[in-house]
Amino acid sequence: APTDMYSFGL
């Protein structure tokens, strides 16, 4: 997902 725990949606 784009805004996951490690992917901060950057």
Curated annotation (Swiss-Prot):
Secreted is among the record's keywords: yes
Q: Which GO terms describe its biological process?
A: neuropeptide signaling pathway
The listed locations are: Secreted
- Identify the keywords attached in UniProt to this record, alphabetized: Amidation, Neuropeptide, Secreted
> Which protein is depicted?
Carcinustatin-19
Origin organism of this chain? Carcinus maenas
| Family indicated by similarity | Belongs to the allatostatin family.
Q: Which GO terms describe its cellular component?
A: extracellular region
Query: Is Secreted a UniProt keyword of this protein?
Result: yes
Biological function: May act as a neurotransmitter or neuromodulator.
Q: Modified residue Leucine amide is at which positions? A: L10
